[in-house]
Regions:
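Extended, well-ordered protein cores
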Residues: 1-249
Length: 249
């Protein structure tokens, strides 16, 4: 079951800055089923049945690691709800994407990332490589087998659809956006190292929360306003907020 987001932790009382924001995680909580009615698993199956090639990918050398990853996830759920990406195992080289199943992406496609090193995966995010690239690589190299780490990443969206694959061309936020028609798109992320292959397993869950309801708490509203108003312009454009953040803040 999903815990309510800790909005005060996600939006600290400070100007916006890129941050890893990692903390010790709980594999059982993250990978066990959150949706007791099975709707999330059903939607996942529907998209995969429609076009699996858009959401799944695997390099030839990744077969053993993928089998290990699927077996590991099956220890928590027979139909895992999170998306997942598998990174190469060598701690002495920059990890690159070797496999995954990403049904609910935030405006990116797994096929475009397959085979790429993390520096290339993160390259579209303004400032990330300069500010955090070295720290990310060091952290990934030090992850121990069966350890668990979690973080969140937030964005805003014009709908509460989970599947934001770029091929869908969904409506975007713009100059007429309002809080009641805007959702916080929250990515819950998980990292561990598989014990046999050494591959890095990266899990992603997406939840959507209507902005006007979240900001009913005055302190939360003030912190979100501060984050939006201090978001650097290149990042605001990357997140699709450059035309509307003053309306939403």
């Amino acid at each position: 079951m999903m815990n309510a987001p800790d909005w005060l932790r996600l939006f600290p009382e400070a100007d916006y800055r890129l941050s890893m924001g990692l903390r010790p995680g709980n594999a059982g909580r993250f990978w066990s089923d959150w949706d007791s009615e099975g709707r999330l698993a059903a939607e996942r199956s529907r998209w995969l049945a429609e076009s699996a090639a858009d959401y799944q990918g695997c390099l030839p050398e990744a077969g053993d690691a993928v089998r290990e990853a699927r077996s590991w996830m099956a220890g928590y759920s027979q139909a895992p709800e999170p998306d997942w990406v598998l990174l190469s195992p060598d701690p002495h080289e920059e990890p690159h994407v070797i496999a995954g199943e990403v049904v609910f992406p935030s405006s990116w496609a797994l096929a475009d990332k397959l085979g790429q090193p993390m520096s290339s995966v993160h390259a579209p995010v303004p400032g990330l490589q300069v500010q955090m690239g070295a720290g990310i690589r060091t952290f990934l190299a030090k992850i121990e087998p069966d350890s668990a780490w979690e973080r969140e990443n937030w964005g805003l969206a014009a709908d509460d659809e989970l599947n934001h694959h770029p091929k869908r061309s969904l409506p975007r936020l713009g100059r007429h956006s309002q809080p009641k028609t805007t959702w916080i798109r929250l990515e819950h992320q998980f990292l561990t190292r598989l014990p046999k292959s050494g591959g890095l397993l990266f899990g992603i869950r997406v939840t959507c929360h209507r902005l006007d309801l979240v900001t009913q708490v005055p302190e939360v509203r003030a912190r979100i306003q501060r984050a939006l108003s201090t978001l650097p312009e290149p990042l605001a454009r990357y997140k699709g907020l450059h035309e509307c953040r003053h309306l939403l803040a």
